[in-house]
Amino acid sequence: MTEGSPIKFELVDINAILQTLPHRFPMLLIDRVINIRADYSGIGIKNVTFNEPAFQGHFPERPVYPGVMMIEAMAQTAGVIGIKSVEGTEKPRAVYFLTIDKCKFRKPVLPGDTIEYHMRSLGRRKTMWWFHGDAKVNGQVVAEADVGAMLTD
């Protein structure tokens, strides 16, 4: 993220996310997105609670938030950033998650953690977007990946 890049949206709350993405419980995996900047970067926020449906099976004796959920949340954060960034100039209505590259899981995420999905654009070609994401808990990277998506109308 470029600190000098102007902020376009300081806060996209859950109500705005529900208007932007088609995802709903249990697959809506971000609570808000903050600091969407003109350079197509921003931060998704997820407050992880023990009530997450995934914890029923991952793992009952030692709950660990699934890495696949973090990757999906990165894609959702990138989708919000992409749609909000072109709002008013284009009319995308759907985001399709297409690729995952360079994915690494570094530390477990536990109930009570707050995950910050730091996403920044790697580039765009017409309706295709590529983002790099770092998932962080307390400032430490717990997962990272490059994700690709397509915005369509």
UniProtKB/Swiss-Prot annotation:
EC number, UniProt record: 4.2.1.59
A single GO molecular function term of this UniProt record: (3R)-hydroxyacyl-[acyl-carrier-protein] dehydratase activity
Alphabetized InterPro entries for the sequence: FabA_FabZ, FabZ, HotDog_dom_sf
A Pfam cross-reference name: FabA
Keyword terms of this UniProt record: Cytoplasm, Lipid A biosynthesis, Lipid biosynthesis, Lipid metabolism, Lyase
Coiled-coil region(s): none
Catalytic reactions on record: a (3R)-hydroxyacyl-[ACP] = a (2E)-enoyl-[ACP] + H2O
Active-site annotation: H58
Compartments reported by the entry: Cytoplasm
GO cellular component: cytoplasm; membrane
BP term (GO), one: fatty acid biosynthetic process
Chain's role: Involved in unsaturated fatty acids biosynthesis. Catalyzes the dehydration of short chain beta-hydroxyacyl-ACPs and long chain saturated and unsaturated beta-hydroxyacyl-ACPs.
Family designation: Belongs to the thioester dehydratase family. FabZ subfamily.
Name of the protein: 3-hydroxyacyl-[acyl-carrier-protein] dehydratase FabZ
Organism, as annotated: Bradyrhizobium diazoefficiens (strain JCM 10833 / BCRC 13528 / IAM 13628 / NBRC 14792 / USDA 110)
Gene giving rise to this polypeptide: fabZ
